[in-house]
Amino acid sequence: MQNITQSWFVQGMIKATTDAWLKGWDERNGGNLTLRLDDADIAPYHDNFHQQPRYIPLSQPMPLLANTPFIVTGSGKFFRNVQLDPAANLGIVKVDSDGAGYHILWGLTNEAVPTSELPAHFLSHFERIKATNGKDRVIMHCHATNLIALTYVLENDTAVFTRQLWEGSTECLVVFPDGVGILPWMVPGTDEIGQATAQEMQKHSLVLWPFHGVFGSGPTLDETFGLIDTAEKSAQILVKVYSMSGMKQTISREELIALGQRFGVTPLASALAL
């Protein structure tokens, strides 16, 4: 019998959650992570599955996700503990044939359940599948320190925030030319914040929750982690710059245009226009 904890997807989740905790982005039970899988990924590990998988209904149907398996972090679980006990802190779930609920196939032992932000994750997966023709498979939410700090001092506007991050580090425009979506402050763990996040995910691979954290989407765990890491590095630079009396020079609009042309990306027009 193959051991599912040695699979690429469990090992990938262990690395991503451990790295995020070491970055200081996921204190206590902060943060959540989901990876969309294929049946072929989990097929070799059926002998590891629960004999009687628990069924949990969704608060709203997700027909586009019908029959789709995911590996997810658990509600109330600490990222720092995933590496110590993957089966207690992670779970593989599979949405049923009509998208009305899901079964917990593996993990989430002792009656644990998936992250409370599962509505936001599933709704965002739904939108990113459409936006990227199925390329994006990962949704990551974390409490990236400097990005959160900037939501207290910058205007919480997509164009403004995006432009500042682009100017904070040259690679940012190349990594997220589609900019950063921003929500108003909302109560977490609700369908409402999930729907608002998913709406922004139609246009952006990064979405900020002011005074709370960030959502990122990408095709792989590495790409998604790297996306957030890049934005957070720029935010860290900006926090230092603002504490040293602000910018005296920066990347100009013309230089941003040249950067986009060099790397074949189309920068968010509203941010470029500022």
Swiss-Prot record:
GO biological process: pentose catabolic process; rhamnose catabolic process
Gene3D superfamilies (UniProt xref): Class II aldolase/adducin N-terminal domain
Cofactor(s) needed: Zn(2+)
Keyword Cytoplasm belongs to the record: yes
Predominant location category: cytoplasm
Family membership: Belongs to the aldolase class II family. RhaD subfamily.
The protein, known as: Rhamnulose-1-phosphate aldolase
Organism name: Escherichia coli O81 (strain ED1a)
